[in-house]
Amino acid sequence: MAREKFERTKPHVNIGTIGHVDHGKTTLTAAITMAMAARGGSAGKKYDEIDSSPEEKARGITINTAHVEYETATRHYAHVDCPGHADYVKNMITGAAQMDGAILVVSGADGPMPQTKEHILLAKQVGVPNIVVFLNKEDQVDDEELLELVDMEIRETLSSYDFPGDEIPVIAGSALLALEALSSNPKIGDGEDKWVDKIFSLMDNVDSYIPTPARETDKTFLMAVEDVFSITGRGTVATGRVERGTVKVGASIEIIGYVDTRVATVTGLEMFQKTLEESVAGDNVGVLLRGIQKEDIERGMVLAQPGTITPHTKFEAQVYVLKKEEGGRHTPFFPGYRPQFYVRTTDVTGKIESFISDEGDEATMVMPGDRVKMVVELIQPIAIENGMRFAIREGGRTVGAGVVSSILK
């Protein structure tokens, strides 16, 4: 069967459902796909089609995630939903499914719970920029005042993690009752069912509140170097995949990492043995550089638009440590541990100086399966920025995955 061509007519946005276990994330995901299908978007997905999510690997870690897609009048959405709490932690830290925004699902009957707070904290630290709240199970709350209290509590919780709690849209409803109405009448329209209207309202708010992200090609140029060779009489070629932005022949770029930053001019671009005038995000390209010797550049360095990224050695990161069953360590590790940090295209040795718990206390050791904040000092400077992902490796196997939350030095 021929694959459907992906029609790119509307702007694309990546979102996901986050929140405490059993507050209704998957039910809401199913209700959204069916509500958008009723409005004339793509086909709906039932609860069990979403819940039986396949495993995928990101940075050597197995994660269960369900991906669904749907359309509103103005946008195309890719939506990720994870069945288990550990899958969320792993997904958000590895960036397996990047989120431009999230729908935080909170049960109106229970209010914010420990995982609600943990997901908000993670969203903040891994750089999920915007959150819209769905206050679920409204039908189970008899007292209107109780719902208002939960609304206030969620807003305060969001504000305490530096999200704009007062501005964030909070839509109350019942994902289950909406899903039941949609299952009995898949063509239901606006104004025909109170609960389905709440789902329509939620997505109208997601459309208007979550901004369309900048496209990768509009960002500043960055490419991690994978390989280097020299062409006699022409100069040195660095190959790699353009991570973001665009680069043109004749442009000045910086070479960053390990040693002092150098500036070079791009004298040629090649892809699949053909020359290009310009290369864009996603291209695997050879970049010909003038005035640079083969010894001056190596795998793991990056080429970037001048002044946009700087080399650093010390940072704070949010890290998930693999369990033994996931191929991780069998034993805990302590401050002073020196593994390899695999960043973009290469390993750099680093020392873990300290661990910090969510409460801000210093921890003395980390067990396999833990999520922890740590301070790392690398032995060589490399190009680092907030939100950058990395893997922690020891003897060739992945023992953890992390995301940079702040740069210290």
Swiss-Prot record:
<keyword id="KW-0479">Metal-binding</keyword>
<dbReference type="InterPro" id="IPR009001">
    <property type="entry name" value="Transl_elong_EF1A/Init_IF2_C"/>
</dbReference>
<dbReference type="GO" id="GO:0005525">
    <property type="term" value="F:GTP binding"/>
</dbReference>
<feature type="binding site">
    <location>
        <begin position="19"/>
        <end position="26"/>
    </location>
    <ligand>
        <name>GTP</name>
    </ligand>
</feature>
<keyword id="KW-0934">Plastid</keyword>
<feature type="domain" description="tr-type G">
    <location>
        <begin position="10"/>
        <end position="214"/>
    </location>
</feature>
<dbReference type="GO" id="GO:0003746">
    <property type="term" value="F:translation elongation factor activity"/>
</dbReference>
<keyword id="KW-0460">Magnesium</keyword>
<dbReference type="InterPro" id="IPR004541">
    <property type="entry name" value="Transl_elong_EFTu/EF1A_bac/org"/>
</dbReference>
<keyword id="KW-0378">Hydrolase</keyword>
<dbReference type="InterPro" id="IPR031157">
    <property type="entry name" value="G_TR_CS"/>
</dbReference>
<keyword id="KW-0251">Elongation factor</keyword>
<feature type="binding site">
    <location>
        <begin position="81"/>
        <end position="85"/>
    </location>
    <ligand>
        <name>GTP</name>
    </ligand>
</feature>
<keyword id="KW-0342">GTP-binding</keyword>
<feature type="region of interest" description="G2">
    <location>
        <begin position="60"/>
        <end position="64"/>
    </location>
</feature>
<dbReference type="GO" id="GO:0005739">
    <property type="term" value="C:mitochondrion"/>
</dbReference>
<dbReference type="InterPro" id="IPR000795">
    <property type="entry name" value="T_Tr_GTP-bd_dom"/>
</dbReference>
<dbReference type="InterPro" id="IPR004160">
    <property type="entry name" value="Transl_elong_EFTu/EF1A_C"/>
</dbReference>
<feature type="region of interest" description="G1">
    <location>
        <begin position="19"/>
        <end position="26"/>
    </location>
</feature>
<comment type="function">
    <text>GTP hydrolase that promotes the GTP-dependent binding of aminoacyl-tRNA to the A-site of ribosomes during protein biosynthesis.</text>
</comment>
<dbReference type="GO" id="GO:0070125">
    <property type="term" value="P:mitochondrial translational elongation"/>
</dbReference>
<dbReference type="Pfam" id="PF03144">
    <property type="entry name" value="GTP_EFTU_D2"/>
</dbReference>
<dbReference type="Pfam" id="PF03143">
    <property type="entry name" value="GTP_EFTU_D3"/>
</dbReference>
<protein>
    <recommendedName>
        <fullName>Elongation factor Tu, chloroplastic</fullName>
        <ecNumber>3.6.5.3</ecNumber>
    </recommendedName>
</protein>
<keyword id="KW-0547">Nucleotide-binding</keyword>
<dbReference type="InterPro" id="IPR050055">
    <property type="entry name" value="EF-Tu_GTPase"/>
</dbReference>
<dbReference type="Pfam" id="PF00009">
    <property type="entry name" value="GTP_EFTU"/>
</dbReference>
<dbReference type="InterPro" id="IPR009000">
    <property type="entry name" value="Transl_B-barrel_sf"/>
</dbReference>
<dbReference type="InterPro" id="IPR033720">
    <property type="entry name" value="EFTU_2"/>
</dbReference>
<dbReference type="InterPro" id="IPR027417">
    <property type="entry name" value="P-loop_NTPase"/>
</dbReference>
<feature type="binding site">
    <location>
        <position position="26"/>
    </location>
    <ligand>
        <name>Mg(2+)</name>
    </ligand>
</feature>
<dbReference type="GO" id="GO:0003924">
    <property type="term" value="F:GTPase activity"/>
</dbReference>
<dbReference type="InterPro" id="IPR005225">
    <property type="entry name" value="Small_GTP-bd"/>
</dbReference>
<feature type="region of interest" description="G4">
    <location>
        <begin position="136"/>
        <end position="139"/>
    </location>
</feature>
<keyword id="KW-0648">Protein biosynthesis</keyword>
<keyword id="KW-0150">Chloroplast</keyword>
<feature type="region of interest" description="G3">
    <location>
        <begin position="81"/>
        <end position="84"/>
    </location>
</feature>
<feature type="region of interest" description="G5">
    <location>
        <begin position="174"/>
        <end position="176"/>
    </location>
</feature>
<dbReference type="InterPro" id="IPR041709">
    <property type="entry name" value="EF-Tu_GTP-bd"/>
</dbReference>
<dbReference type="InterPro" id="IPR004161">
    <property type="entry name" value="EFTu-like_2"/>
</dbReference>
<comment type="similarity">
    <text>Belongs to the TRAFAC class translation factor GTPase superfamily. Classic translation factor GTPase family. EF-Tu/EF-1A subfamily.</text>
</comment>
<dbReference type="GO" id="GO:0009507">
    <property type="term" value="C:chloroplast"/>
</dbReference>
